[in-house]
Amino acid sequence: RSIKAARGRILDRNGVVLADNKMVCTVSVIHNQIEEPEQVIAILVKELGISEEEARKRVEKYSSIERVKSNVDKTVGDRIREYDLAGVKVDEDYKRYYPYGDLASKVLGFTGGDNQGIIGLEVVYEEILQGDPGMILTITDAKGIEVDTAGERRVEPVPGMDLRISIDRNIQEYATQLAAQACATKEADSVYIVAMNPQNG
């Protein structure tokens, strides 16, 4: 199983974090390791807020590993882990988080559901931000089903590198406020602000 690497942060010129990571979890089940299917179904329904039909479909599916839900809040993932249910795996994952909301969002861009950059700086600097994923290595039988008694080996992921940019968060926030005021006052469809050094253009 793959372990996602923590994505590199995006910092402003003063080191203020504009794009960060929030730890979440991915919950999966391994059919041939489940000992109490009805208990597993009940807990997945209760903790993940999915329907009994959906939980049962995942639990009863014959596959090496079946993902039940991604981007699960870490507190929920920790609770599920505490049940210590045979055949239920809770892996830590990361979700992109922007502390200042949509500030400079057209420049920063954003990531998709797989945490890969799809627009803006997030995609332009994907190679340095993404890091290298790790792996959980397990032994499977001829059908690809994990052998529970064989144990597993973990190869840790390598986090992505941080990216420091020339934007100043304070100036950007001030410019955003001025643009909003001008847009409202002039009843404009859109507003653009250009910052320029008057000495050299």
What would you call each of these model-derived segments?
Residues 1-3, 153:
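Extreme N-terminal "leader" segments
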Residues 13-16, 23, 30-34, 71-73, ...:
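Solvent-exposed coil/turn segments that connect beta secondary-structure elements
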Residues 4-49:
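Juxtamembrane extramembrane loops of integral membrane proteins
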Residues 147-191:
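Conserved, well-ordered alpha-helix/loop/beta-strand core segments that scaffold catalytic motifs
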Residues 39-46, 60-160:
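Small/polar-residue-rich segments within soluble enzyme cores
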Residues 52-58, 89-94, 184-196:
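Surface-exposed patches in mature extracellular/periplasmic domains of secreted proteins
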Residues 6-13, 187-200:
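A short, well-structured edge-of-sheet supersecondary motif
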